[in-house]
């Protein structure tokens, strides 16, 4: 039984979400290429990146995830700069979009080990934003390191009108589905331990 879970991510949001489950973590960020391959469907993209992250980090039990905002089939990753964040926010303004997270749990046990994964989708309805709102928000710096250029758990939450599905997925890690994958990998959650 793995006593410690390795999180293959430097995301403070994923760390905070897992802390809500009472999990002791070892943080080992994965160094992987997160570019979308030509013609790669968004679901395949987030799952591929999550798997690559999980495989790139040593450990008995490794958890990795990748989140993307998808609008009209286009993956909106983290903005390159403030202008790119403005472009993304203008595109999201007044629309419904999807947030996809690929989650991978890799357990190195026995001769073969186990790799379990899932893709979770959440639909988000965004308010109509004017240039003043967009400029103010980009000026806060908050959207510059977030997929799709917004943080539902921060000031960007003021622009979200509706969420269908997992809110924690939009933050960066679907907790219910992640807990289910950990259980299937033989990792008991804190409330299941003697």
Swiss-Prot record:
Q: Where in the cell is it found?
A: Cytoplasm
- Hydrolase listed as a keyword: yes
Q: Which SUPFAM superfamilies match?
A: ITPase-like
Recorded catalytic reaction(s): these are: dTTP + H2O = dTMP + diphosphate + H(+); UTP + H2O = UMP + diphosphate + H(+)
Top-level EC class, please?
hydrolase
Cellular component annotations (GO), alphabetically ordered? cytoplasm
The keyword Hydrolase is assigned to this record:
yes
Tell me the cofactors it needs: a divalent metal cation
- Name the job this protein performs: Nucleoside triphosphate pyrophosphatase that hydrolyzes dTTP and UTP. May have a dual role in cell division arrest and in preventing the incorporation of modified nucleotides into cellular nucleic acids.
- What's the protein here called? dTTP/UTP pyrophosphatase
**What organism does the UniProt record list as the source?**
Anaeromyxobacter sp. (strain K)
UniProt lineage: Bacteria, Pseudomonadati, Myxococcota, Myxococcia, Myxococcales
